[in-house]
Amino acid sequence: MKKEFEQIILNLSDEEWEFNGVTHDRQIVRAIVFDDEGYFYFVRVDRDDDFGRAVYIETAGGGVESEEELEIAIHRELKEELGVSVEVLCKIGVVSDYYNLIKRHNINNYYLCRAISVGEKHLTEDEINQYHLSTLKLTYDEAIAEYEKGRELPIGRIVCNRELPILKRAKEILDTYIE
């Protein structure tokens, strides 16, 4: 059953790289995924590209395809990156942030989702070869620690600033409202 909660709306800037304009906006869906045993699911990114050598934690998700509804996109992305089928419980909020290095404005739509079943992932070639995505199953405290570790890197700080408030709000919702 989908419920509605007060959503977080955040507008963040990229303090890591100089702003040189924006060439494109990207609609993105992301999720805090949890299971009935109290674990949260994330992806570990291991990359070496224009953003530098970096290993950090991030929520699963990705770009919304043209004409695609947000909730359809979140189901597709979670199946691809985590191999999970989910129940979407609620929208947590929207975080607007920037990747100045690639002149992109991100509109991140976050959902709270309960894992129903876990199956095979369907990663793209870039997700396998460039970002080396792997699945992490963590407790809430372990996830917080992973995000804090990521603060050592420029891209990790951007991700942490965007996602820690969302993770904390998801935990509040789970602790307060969800059976």
Spell out what each predicted region is:
Residues D97-H122, L136:
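Active-site-adjacent beta-strand/loop module that shapes the phosphate/pyrophosphate-binding cleft
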Residues S85-G93:
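A short coil-to-beta-strand element that immediately follows conserved catalytic motifs
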Residues M1-R30, D36:
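Acidic, metal-coordinating catalytic segment for phosphate/diphosphate chemistry
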Residues Y39-E80:
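Conserved Nudix-box catalytic region and its N-terminal flanking loop in Nudix hydrolases
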Residues E120, D126-E179:
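Nudix hydrolase/Nudix homology domain
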Residues A31, K91, N109-Y111:
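A structural signal for short, well-ordered beta-strand segments
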Residues F34-Y39, D48-D49, E65, L112-E120:
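Short, charged/polar surface micro-motifs in flexible loops or helix N-caps
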